[in-house]
């Protein structure tokens, strides 16, 4: 099961999340990155972890367990146990926009203001190839060595898992407001991408600005095998973009956004959207009432969902690598991994977490969005690994479409 999941994740070569804000800078960053090479090996910053018990963490929204007071229980416990103070910052709304903010410092080998970040697999691979990452030390992460699921233990980009270590994974499908969708369409739930183009939803549909997920879902709906270079070719990609452009131009689409699409669901600016699996759990938690404890739903389109993974990395200029390794080791304890997974509802890469979760919540431990079985994985797909030329062409075309949206 996990071997299949990771193989898909390895092929996921372009951004998971994207926001229209700053998209011009994103395109520029992408162009620069595709032309860059690591001509000289960079030297990692001196590690000050022995004397400075701090670290700064860049992560995505809705990606940490949270209590009613806005605290992060597992992270607070790590700080208490380790004595390391964590400055946890929600800085990544999209891989490319995040990269645009930090690329200048990375190119110079300087501190980007974060000791650890969790970009998507494709971005972690890019940063590694450019020489922008520090190697991690397994001696400081015995839990990672013991509990990293077998399917994750190597990747074509990082065979020995020296530079990147899985954080969480998930699916992209369709999220929707149950009550509003029923009122608008008369149906209980959407079942296909075509349902998003229904006239009853005009102006009330959101799309993720993540190319691999939104375009991927449309490609799947057109019968394209996105795991195959023969099937997912230039003509297929252009045809999918044409469908999306038609829906934008017609006014069917309210907007195209990154993580902030959740705001539009919460305020009912949109009724349905391409969405990330765990996010719908979070918005249900935030918007639940006694009368309606689960106002939002998430479904795989009948033609399949897309799949992605995000990974811990330590930038070349970070000065607290040993502290980060202690953090990673902590989250690879199955008890901590289970607690996190049961809250964020994303796929955990930690062996033993499911068994721990089953003790706490047997029903949730069978949730296919957290612990997917072979049947669920068979319905999810990721882009085949793109060449540099393909990545440049597809990403530029997507960004140009967003600029005109």
For each feature predicted by the language model, list its residue ranges:
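Early extracytoplasmic/lumenal segment of secretory-pathway proteins
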Residues: 48-125
């Amino acid at each position: 099961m996990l071997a299949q999941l990771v193989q898909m994740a390895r092929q996921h070569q372009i951004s998971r999340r994207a926001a229209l804000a700053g998209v011009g800078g994103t395109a520029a960053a992408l162009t620069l990155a595709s032309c860059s090479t690591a001509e000289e090996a960079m030297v990692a910053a001196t590690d000050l972890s022995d004397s400075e018990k701090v670290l700064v963490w860049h992560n995505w929204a809705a990606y940490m367990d949270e209590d009613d007071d806005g605290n992060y229980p597992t992270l607070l416990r790590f700080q208490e146990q380790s004595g390391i103070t964590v400055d946890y910052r929600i800085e990544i709304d999209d891989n490319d926009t995040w990269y645009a903010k930090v690329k200048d410092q990375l190119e110079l080998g300087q501190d980007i203001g974060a000791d650890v970040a969790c970009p998507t697999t494709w971005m972690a691979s890019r940063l590694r190839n450019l020489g922008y990452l520090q190697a991690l030390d397994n001696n400081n992460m015995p839990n990672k060595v013991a509990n990293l699921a077998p399917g994750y233990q190597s990747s074509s980009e990082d065979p020995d898992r020296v530079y990147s270590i899985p954080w969480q994974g998930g699916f992209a499908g369709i999220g929707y407001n149950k009550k509003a969708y029923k009122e608008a369409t008369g149906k209980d739930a959407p079942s296909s991408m075509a349902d998003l183009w229904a006239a009853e939803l005009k102006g009330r549909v959101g799309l993720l600005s993540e190319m691999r997920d939104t375009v991927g879902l449309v490609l799947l709906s057109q019968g394209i095998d996105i795991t195959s270079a023969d099937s997912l070719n230039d003509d297929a990609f252009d045809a999918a973009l044409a469908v999306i452009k038609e829906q934008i131009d017609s006014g069917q689409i309210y907007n195209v956004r990154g993580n902030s699409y959740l705001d539009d669901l919460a305020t009912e600016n949109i009724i349905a959207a391409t969405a990330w699996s765990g996010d719908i759990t979070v918005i249900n938690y935030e918007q639940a009432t006694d009368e309606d404890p689960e106002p939002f739903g998430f479904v795989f389109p009948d033609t399949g969902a897309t799949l992605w993974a995000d990974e811990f990395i330590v930038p070349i200029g970070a000065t607290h690598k040993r502290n980060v390794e202690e953090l990673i080791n902590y989250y690879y304890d199955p008890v901590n991994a289970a607690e996190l997974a049961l809250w964020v509802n994303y796929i955990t890469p930690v062996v033993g977490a499911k068994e721990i979760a089953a003790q706490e919540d047997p029903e949730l431990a069978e949730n296919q969005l957290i612990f997917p079985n072979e049947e669920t994985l068979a319905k999810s797909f990721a882009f085949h690994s793109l060449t540099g030329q393909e990545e440049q062409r597809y990403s530029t075309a997507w960004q140009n479409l967003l600029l005109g949206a």
